[in-house]
């Protein structure tokens, strides 16, 4: 009975080298060996960030403004009141948008409630619309 070629080559090292044909084939190194050489194409295709990221990293904290329109304040007025961001002091209505998490008041839409609005920044359009109905804007304790 003659052994087949594969069986003959399994133990020796002439036909396929020492370890080839024993189950794992010819690996070309284990793990990440050869990523910069013979496994380069695999790395570029399946692991493009293998040697590190690309581009620049921003190391400063970016401050993102959270804006709100006058029309949105009008629309959300009841929910702001329910959540405690609208209060009444000395007969004057105060809307604290800074405490509600907003940084800038934009002038799109209409606001009809005469009140004092507390916010850090406001556009000229928002200020003119509010002053037309007799409202004020306060930022850092000073009126705008």
Curated annotation (Swiss-Prot):
Question: Is Nucleus found in the keyword set?
Answer: no
Against Pfam families, the record matches this protein to: Ribosomal_L27A
Bias (Basic residues) ranges: 1-13
Q: Where is this region: Disordered?
A: 1-32
Q: InterPro entries attached here?
A: Rbsml_uL15_N, Ribosomal_uL15, Ribosomal_uL15/eL18, Ribosomal_uL15/eL18_sf
Transcription regulation recorded as keyword: no
Which Gene Ontology MF annotations are present?
A: rRNA binding; structural constituent of ribosome
Q: Which GO terms describe its biological process?
A: translation
**GO cellular component: a single term:** cytosolic large ribosomal subunit
Q: Which UniProt keywords apply?
A: Ribonucleoprotein, Ribosomal protein, RNA-binding, rRNA-binding
Biological function: Binds to the 23S rRNA.
Quaternary structure and interacting proteins, as annotated: Part of the 50S ribosomal subunit.
Question: Record's family?
Answer: Belongs to the universal ribosomal protein uL15 family.
Output this protein's name.
Large ribosomal subunit protein uL15
The species is Thermoplasma acidophilum (strain ATCC 25905 / DSM 1728 / JCM 9062 / NBRC 15155 / AMRC-C165)
The gene for this chain is rpl15
């Amino acid at each position: 009975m003659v052994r087949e070629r594969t069986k003959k080559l399994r133990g020796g090292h002439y036909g396929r080298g020492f370890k080839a044909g024993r189950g794992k084939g010819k690996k070309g190194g284990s793990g990440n060996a050869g990523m910069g050489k013979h496994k380069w194409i695999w790395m570029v295709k399946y692991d493009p960030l293998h040697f590190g990221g690309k581009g620049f990293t921003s190391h400063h904290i970016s401050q993102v403004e959270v804006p709100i329109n006058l029309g949105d304040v009008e629309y959300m007025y009841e929910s702001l009141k329910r959540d405690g961001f609208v209060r009444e002091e000395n007969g004057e209505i105060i809307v604290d948008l800074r405490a509600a998490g907003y940084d800038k008041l934009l002038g799109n839409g209409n606001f009809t409630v005469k009140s004092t609005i507390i916010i850090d920044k406001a556009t000229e359009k928002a200020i003119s619309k509010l002053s037309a109905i007799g409202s004020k804007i306060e930022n850092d304790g000073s009126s705008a």
